[in-house]
Amino acid sequence: MKKSVYYFQQRDRQESILKETNIFERVPGNGLWWNKEENQWEKYPHILQHQDSLKNLFSPIRQEVMSYFEEYDIAWWREDDDRYFPTGNLLSSQIHCLNHLFRIRKDPEAVLSIIKAQCKDIVKVLPSPIDWHEYVFEDDQKKKINSYISFEFALDNPHLLQERTCKRGKDCTSVDAFVYAENINGNRILIPIEWKYTESYERDDEYKAKDYVVNKRYKDLASRDYSNLNGWKNEFYWDPLYEFARQTLLMEQIIHEKPKCGAFPIKATDYIHIIVRPDENKEIIDDIKQFKDLVKAEGKKRIIEVDPQELLSPLRGNEKYKDLLTYLETRYWK
């Protein structure tokens, strides 16, 4: 992955916040990261040391995020093989996504407010089809708590996409976040949310998807009448279009095949693909535009791109999330 001007701006920003604020509780940086050019591990100021990497997450969500990832056996994005602990990389988009969305995942009103601001026809968010509900006791009463945002969403990938596994966050098509919703007509809608932060991508052959993988798994699906991809394009062999295309196919296959999650099939008639990216990341914005230009007109209408600050703007004025917005403004938005 190449490094853009925006990447270096955000790296400098995170290093400054690490040194000058209490956001990371005054822990040092200089954690280890693999230098591909030098083929060795090196220390970097914007990488938290391993024992401090949990502090990359917003403090009120840390333990619950860890429990969530452990309960659903979700892999963390990391530079090494230890995929069971969050990365110390302050520029991680997985961490960026969790810091923005995890706090509100059990609040249907908050989740609906941010989704409806982007998709006006959505009138209701539904409990996650892949996360189990929880029970808590309040005033001696048993209360059911649902999750309305799933993270690292994957579902029946071996059947739907002919992939080897369905492990959330690793070795299969996953979506950073996912909302199951209902529109004004009572139809159920799949809302995958792909999250980008400082990413920019290279088109070198070493980053190209393998022909045999695409031919076996995705090319036929992309050519079916109901697919908005309108065939597998050459540009789809490279990220991020490779990600966007596979996520589109996963949603289309869920709609077409109605796979069961537990005892019940997941029913949906349509999808809305939300891609969250900072307004300042011009490279990823250009990539999204290219993807829109390559899909069918019906597919283009189903892609919504939004800046993370704009996405969470409906929460302004909500006292429940004042501390969250203050954190996000200090760390990412200002």
Language model features: what each stretch is:
Residues 1-334:
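Charged, terminal alpha-helix-loop-beta segments
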